[in-house]
Amino acid sequence: TWSTTKLAKEVSPDSIELLSDVIALVRPGSMDAGMTDEYIRRRNGKTWKKKHPIYEKIMESTYGVMVYQEQVMDVIHRVAGLPYTTADKIRKIIAKKHDVKLFAPFKKQFIEGCLEKKTLSEKEAKEFWEALQAHGKYSFNKSHATEYAIIGYWCAYVKYYYPTEFICANLIHGSETKKEELIEEAKRLGLTLI
């Protein structure tokens, strides 16, 4: 998509892991919570206030930004001390795009858990919870994002090194609604159309 291409240019991914982050960040939950812009700033060298060593360790590979469902589960378990069964219930709410009101019963447990473990202040716990609710609109799990990243990488490789074959295969096997767009792309690439 246009938004994925734009974000990839801003992030300049040089690994499948970073490309997976790009795929996961172009989701409504991440974008609505401002996580995408924050990720770009941090990837480009902006420093940030560290929340807690456990939290930062979980978010280390994503520059302190919560990107994946697995990170959400780890924070819920390791920062608030809630069991993985509870974290998994929250993950299911995230995965199924349920109404954020379904998060309400878990908010108090999370904040109390953070205070009891002395991992996050009440204010920080509430801020995290707000970010978590934004994730409820839709986010990927890491394996799903990685799968899309690998497919995207392969497609980009074939398009770059074998543009005729790429366009031809997509015209034959691709979506009917994309054919006009593919013909324009073929012209842009200087390919001869018969």
Give a label for each model feature.
Residues W2-I194:
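Noncatalytic, beta-rich nucleic-acid-contacting surfaces in large DNA/RNA-processing enzymes
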